[in-house]
């Protein structure tokens, strides 16, 4: 259930009447009744609430006389600002705890009362530009409000000043600065009202009104920032830091910053409009809708309509007024600086592309006169190169849309350098990688062994002699060590080539290690360990026989010509084994010899089955 204002007013009046009647019934006289009311906290709370209700009723009466019915935007702004002012008042009560009294509370309520009329006057003057009809009653109301507010602000500022001089520093400093800031607001509202009045008297639109409004806002915000700064300094010297003035001080600084930026950006936009935006011709106006969306009037060639970077056309004077507040297109809200920066970025990109092409040509010319990098190893590594022609695209080439093809990519091997020795040409090029399962790294065969040229009487077997750099001229050496763009690009390209070579070598070593299996060394029991070890039991022999087949997949060093049984295995073994048997049979025990024969028979039988 929502409590209405009428119910609150009626309840407050009834509670006040009951409180006063109770005091007179108890004390029977006027003076004792007043003392009783002033000493009772409950009675004073009821009287305070009744005073707030009376102030609210007076505000509603003056509002209806001076402003009439409020618009929705005005009521919303008034409500928001009132809540902020109430919170700031509560913070001010905490700062001035020693000066807290009934008079102090009444002064803050009166300050809030006058602030509300300042806010309403500001919003109502701003509505003048958007109102189609301005009546004589509106002018009478506004002039009355501005005169009354100016007189009240001046009176309270002078009262606070003289009170501070005669009685010393007190809470009156706060009220003096608050009314001084309100007086600056009255001055701002008066300037806007006069500018709007002058604009309404002219039959045509006044182009310079926005300029004056912008400079007036900058001037008033500067005054407010100076007042808040001076107030903070005085409060720090006299009392303490004014915490309740932080929010309005921040808002004033931000408004000053915004006004300063608006002045700069508006001047830049107007200069750009006069110098860079083209004037639309009569043929273009005839081929399009010639209605200006700002003023809703027909555009003609005499009015010099301007075309924005987004291709929308408006009156020059309409754009001048529009650019005073914002630098966007009135139709599509495109930032005019963004469009200009986009065009400039396109030109810069074209220039950069041309510079890169020139740098590549210059780098190629510089690299052509240098000796090849590692001529003996250049053919051993594959470099991903783009084949000539669109028809020569390989399966691993980039697909449409700029995405790389499926892995593995096709590798194109760079040709061998022209100054390579002849015996290096006999080495065949590395074969293509063997196909493997999809998604796996391609299997590379081991690198081919270098073939030695057996031709006699040729001098190609000697390695090439390193080139002599003493024949280079001073100009060529300076070009090689230069700090120009072309030299830096050539160095970066050489570093990239080195990285590609290193990565290719690492890749081939990984592939070689993956393809080549690791051959485990066969464990052959030594003679000394067999002599010292006691005869194994049947369980140990069985466990050893179970462990031996686990390594049967690895290649063995024992070879046989034909499968044989365990009884004939010793006779078909290698000569080394046969020759070693008679020499060790005399030193081994029969049990150890039997174990040895079983092991040899087991190994030879598995190799024969493989």
Curated annotation (Swiss-Prot):
Q: Entry's SMART domains?
A: RING
Q: Name one GO molecular function term.
A: zinc ion binding
Effect of gene knockout: Reduced growth rate.
Subcellular location(s) of the protein:
Endoplasmic reticulum membrane
Q: Which residues form the signal peptide?
A: 1-23
Compositionally skewed regions (Polar residues) per UniProt: 452-474
Q: Where are the zinc fingers (RING-type)?
A: 292-333
Which cellular component terms (GO) are annotated to the entry? endomembrane system; endoplasmic reticulum membrane; endoplasmic reticulum quality control compartment
Reactions the enzyme catalyzes? S-ubiquitinyl-[E2 ubiquitin-conjugating enzyme]-L-cysteine + [acceptor protein]-L-lysine = [E2 ubiquitin-conjugating enzyme]-L-cysteine + N(6)-ubiquitinyl-[acceptor protein]-L-lysine
Region (Disordered) residue ranges read 386-408, 452-480, 521-610
Q: Which GO terms describe its biological process?
A: ERAD pathway; IRE1-mediated unfolded protein response; multicellular organism growth; proteasome-mediated ubiquitin-dependent protein catabolic process; protein ubiquitination; regulation of gene expression; regulation of Notch signaling pathway
Q: Which UniProt keywords apply?
A: Endoplasmic reticulum, Membrane, Metal-binding, Signal, Transferase, Transmembrane, Transmembrane helix, Ubl conjugation pathway, Zinc, Zinc-finger
Residues in the Lumenal compartment per record: 24-41, 121-144, 192-215
* Metabolic or biological pathway: Protein modification; protein ubiquitination
Primary location recorded for the protein, binned into one broad class: endoplasmic reticulum
Sorted alphabetically, which InterPro entries does this protein's record hold? HRD1_E3_ubiq-ligases, Znf_RING, Znf_RING/FYVE/PHD
One matching Pfam family: zf-RING_2
Q: How does it assemble?
A: Homodimer.
Name by which UniProt lists this protein: E3 ubiquitin-protein ligase hrd-1
């Amino acid at each position: 259930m929502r409590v209405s204002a009428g119910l609150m007013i009626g309840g407050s009046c009834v509670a006040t009447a009951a409180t006063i009647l109770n005091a007179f019934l108890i004390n029977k006289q006027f003076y004792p009744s007043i003392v009783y009311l002033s000493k009772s906290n409950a009675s004073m709370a009821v009287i305070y609430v009744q005073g707030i209700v009376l102030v609210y009723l007076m505000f509603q009466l003056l509002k209806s006389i001076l402003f009439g019915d409020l618009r929705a935007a005005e009521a919303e702004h008034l409500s928001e600002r009132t809540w902020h002012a109430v919170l700031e008042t509560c913070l001010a009560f905490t700062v001035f705890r020693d000066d807290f009294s009934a008079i102090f509370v009444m002064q803050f309520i009166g300050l809030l009362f006058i602030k509300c009329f300042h806010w309403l006057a500001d919003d109502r003057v701003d509505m003048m530009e958007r109102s189609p009809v301005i009546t004589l009653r509106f002018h009478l109301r506004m002039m009355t409000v501005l005169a009354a507010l100016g007189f009240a602000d001046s009176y309270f500022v002078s009262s606070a000043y003289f009170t501070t001089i005669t009685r010393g520093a007190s809470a009156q400093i706060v009220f003096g600065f608050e009314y001084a800031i309100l007086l600056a607001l009255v001055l701002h509202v008066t300037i806007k009202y006069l500018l709007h009045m002058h604009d309404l008297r002219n039959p045509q639109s006044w182009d310079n009104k926005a300029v004056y409004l912008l400079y007036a806002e900058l001037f008033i915000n500067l005054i407010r920032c100076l007042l808040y700064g001076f107030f903070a300094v005085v409060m720090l010297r006299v009392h303490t830091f004014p915490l309740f003035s932080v929010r309005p001080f921040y808002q004033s600084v931000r408004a000053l910053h915004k006004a300063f930026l608006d002045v700069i950006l508006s001047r830049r936009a107007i200069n750009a409009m006069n110098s860079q935006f083209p004037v639309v011709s009569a043929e273009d106006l005839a081929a399009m809708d010639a209605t200006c969306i700002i003023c809703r009037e027909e555009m003609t060639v005499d009015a010099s309509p301007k075309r924005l970077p987004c291709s929308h056309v408006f009156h020059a004077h309409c754009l001048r007024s529009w650019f005073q507040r914002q630098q966007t297109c009135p139709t599509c809200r495109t930032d005019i600086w963004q469009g200009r920066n986009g065009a400039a970025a396109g030109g810069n990109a074209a220039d950069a592309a041309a510079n890169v092409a020139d740098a590549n040509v210059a780098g190629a010319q510089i690299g052509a006169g240098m000796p090849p990098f590692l001529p003996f190893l250049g053919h051993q590594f594959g470099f991903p190169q783009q084949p000539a022609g669109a028809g020569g695209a390989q399966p691993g080439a980039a697909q449409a849309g700029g995405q790389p093809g499926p892995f593995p990519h096709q590798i194109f091997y760079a040709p061998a350098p022209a100054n390579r020795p002849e015996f290096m040409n006999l080495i065949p090029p590395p074969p293509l990688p063997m196909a493997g399962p999809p998604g796996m790294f391609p299997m590379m065969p081991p690198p081919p062994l270098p073939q030695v040229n057996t031709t006699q009487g040729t001098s190609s077997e000697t390695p090439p002699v390193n080139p002599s750099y003493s024949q280079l001229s001073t100009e060529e050496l300076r070009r090689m060590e230069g700090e120009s763009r072309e030299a830096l690009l050539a160095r970066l390209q050489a570093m990239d080539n080195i990285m590609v070579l290193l990565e290719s070598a690492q890749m081939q070593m990984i592939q070689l290690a993956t393809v080549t299996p690791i051959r485990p060394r066969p464990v052959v029991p030594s003679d000394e360990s067999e002599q010292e070890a006691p005869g194994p039991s049947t369980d140990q022999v069985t466990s050893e026989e179970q462990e031996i087949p686990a390594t049967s997949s690895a290649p063995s060093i024992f070879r046989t010509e034909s499968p044989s049984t365990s009884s004939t295995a010793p006779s078909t073994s290698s000569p080394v084994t046969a020759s070693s048997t008679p020499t060790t049979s005399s030193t081994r025990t029969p049990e150890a010899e039997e174990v040895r024969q079983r092991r040899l028979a087991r190994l030879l039988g598995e190799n024969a089955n493989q």
